[in-house]
Swiss-Prot record:
The lineage of its organism: Viruses, Monodnaviria, Shotokuvirae, Cossaviricota, Papovaviricetes. GO terms for cellular component: host cell; host cell endosome; host cell Golgi apparatus; host cell nucleus; viral capsid. The gene is L2. Keywords: Capsid protein, Cytoplasmic inwards viral transport, Disulfide bond, DNA-binding, Host endosome, Host Golgi apparatus, Host nucleus, Host-virus interaction, Late protein, Microtubular inwards viral transport, Phosphoprotein, Viral penetration into host nucleus, Virion, Virus entry into host cell. This is Minor capsid protein L2. Its main location: virion. Disulfide bonds join C21-C27. Interacts with major capsid protein L1. Interacts with E2; this interaction inhibits E2 transcriptional activity but not the DNA replication function E2. Interacts with host GADD45GIP1. Interacts with host HSPA8; this interaction is required for L2 nuclear translocation. Interacts with host importins KPNB2 and KPNB3. Forms a complex with importin alpha2-beta1 heterodimers via interaction with the importin alpha2 adapter. Interacts with host DYNLT1; this interaction is essential for virus intracellular transport during entry. It comes from Human papillomavirus 13. A motif (Nuclear localization signal) lies at residues 1-12, 446-454. Minor protein of the capsid that localizes along the inner surface of the virion, within the central cavities beneath the L1 pentamers. Plays a role in capsid stabilization through interaction with the major capsid protein L1. Once the virion enters the host cell, L2 escorts the genomic DNA into the nucleus by promoting escape from the endosomal compartments and traffic through the host Golgi network.
Length: 463
């Protein structure tokens, strides 16, 4: 059978033993010297301190805090302590009042000695100036002048005709009978001169600016940042990128689906776009037309959705898609212009239009004067019929397609003319035939067509 050893109990401290055993005289031999600081170490310090002075180093059996002032470097003077608290005022000595002291304090009066019948001593008076007085029986004559004063009188008249009924007490009229002096309007009595003043700013119109040197306001254009390191540059060669970029991302079915004008795309499954450069594109921003290195560039910024988190956020890079439209030439190219009037022998640019000639054409004898090359109207038909065929020469560039114009019908002119026929003399030089029976408006030369306007910027998602 194993014997269990008794647990050792902890001994009480020396201070606790000293408090209980000092009176009974049963203290252990090491308790009293330790508490009363009478050990061998304490005795050595006491004997050594008689011949050696250590100052305020705080060497002793206590804690090593360096005394009240603390430890300082050897050979240095400690700084004086500056108290930051409020300064205490000296106490006022107050006499204490005991319970047996009387509560009534008698007034102390000084004793005064009154001598009855004895005059008060006067201070000595030194001699001063002598004053001589004389008496005269002649009365004094005073010069009194009469002064004139202007008296101001005030009279108050109450007239109920001019008083308003809503006012209980109207202001009475005051008339003054005093003299009123009016000073001249000018300070100097000399003659004055009128000096005209010049007007510097007449108006604030464009012809007369409000400032001396008007500076036009400059508006800073926002920087697009299409060529930063955060964007992947991709050049697109398909021309559909300009008009319908959605065809490069998804396949459209015009039979069952209408035209998709939205530029946001949702891909539920893995798919392959028509163009591999537009893989995982979920958004295309609005287009921007810029010029870079001598080229006109059409740009769009796309957002890829390569990865989705559980919260629904997508993670993907941004791509800058661009396509160069046309180069910008450094110098202007020379364009050859065609003549406006065609030659007489060139009949490729002639158009026939119906016009009403003069009712009574002038008869001209052209037996030997007119030739096929004399005038550009050699191929025109000159007749006296009410309707004639007039040929107008026109010259068009080579890249414009010639289309026949409409027939223009004019109202029939009266057959009676106010002009009498005149028989001219034989011509001696070239003959020019001019007609004055109609006026051909320039817009009737060509057929007016409607142009279909195409917007440069397409519907886009706000960036």
């Amino acid at each position: 059978m194993a014997h269990s050893r008794a647990r050792r109990r902890k001994r009480a401290s020396a201070t606790q033993l000293y408090q209980t055993c000092k009176a009974s005289g049963t203290c252990p031999p090491d308790v009293i010297p330790k508490v009363e600081q009478n050990t061998l170490a304490d005795k050595i310090l006491k004997w050594g301190s008689l011949g050696v002075f250590f100052g305020g180093l705080g060497i002793g059996t206590g804690s090593g805090t360096g005394g009240r002032t603390g430890y300082v470097p050897v050979g240095s003077t400690p700084r004086p302590a500056i108290s930051t608290g409020p300064t205490a005022r000296p106490p006022i000595v107050v006499d204490t009042v005991g319970p047996t002291d009387p509560s009534i304090v008698s007034l102390v009066e000084e004793s005064a000695i009154i001598n009855s019948g004895v005059p008060d001593p006067l201070p000595p008076v030194h001699g001063g100036f002598e004053i001589t007085t004389s008496q005269s029986a002649t009365p004094a004559i005073l010069d009194v002048s009469v002064t004139t004063q202007n008296t101001t009188s005030t009279s108050i008249f109450r007239n109920p005709v001019f008083s308003e009924p809503s006012i209980t007490q109207s202001q009475p009229s005051i008339e003054s009978g005093a003299h009123v002096f009016i000073s001249p309007s000018t300070i100097s009595p000399h003659s004055t001169e009128d000096i005209p003043l010049d007007t510097f700013i007449v108006s604030s119109s464009d012809s007369n600016p409000a400032s001396s040197t008007p500076v036009p306001a400059t508006v800073a254009r926002p920087r697009l940042g299409l060529y930063s390191r955060a964007l992947h540059q991709v050049q697109v060669t398909d021309p559909a990128f300009l008009s319908s970029p959605q065809r490069l991302i998804t396949f459209d079915n015009p039979t069952y689906e209408g035209e998709d004008i939205s530029l946001q795309f949702a891909h539920n499954t893995i798919h392959e776009p028509p163009d591999e450069a537009f893989m995982d594109i979920i958004r295309l921003h609005r287009p921007a037309i810029t010029s870079r290195r001598g080229l006109v560039r059409f740009s769009r910024i796309g957002q890829r959705g390569s990865m989705y988190t559980r919260s629904g956020k997508h993670i993907g890079g941004r791509v800058h898609f661009f396509k160069d439209i046309s180069p910008i030439s450094a110098a202007a190219e020379e364009i050859e212009l065609h003549p406006l009037v065609a030659a007489a022998q060139d009949h490729s640019g002639l158009f026939d239009i119906y016009a009403e000639p003069d009712p009574d054409p002038v008869a001209v004898n052209t037996s030997g004067s007119l030739s096929s090359a004399s005038t550009p109207f050699a191929q025109s038909s000159l007749s006296s019929a009410p309707w004639g065929n007039t040929t107008v020469p026109l010259s068009l560039p080579g890249d414009i397609f010639i289309q026949p114009g409409p027939d223009i019908t004019f109202p029939t002119a009266p057959t009676v003319t106010p002009y009498n026929p005149v028989t001219p003399a034989l011509p001696t030089g070239p003959v020019f035939i001019t007609a004055s029976g109609f006026y051909l408006y320039p817009t009737w030369y060509f057929t007016r067509k409607r142009r279909k306007r195409v917007s440069l910027f397409f519907t886009d998602v706000a960036a």
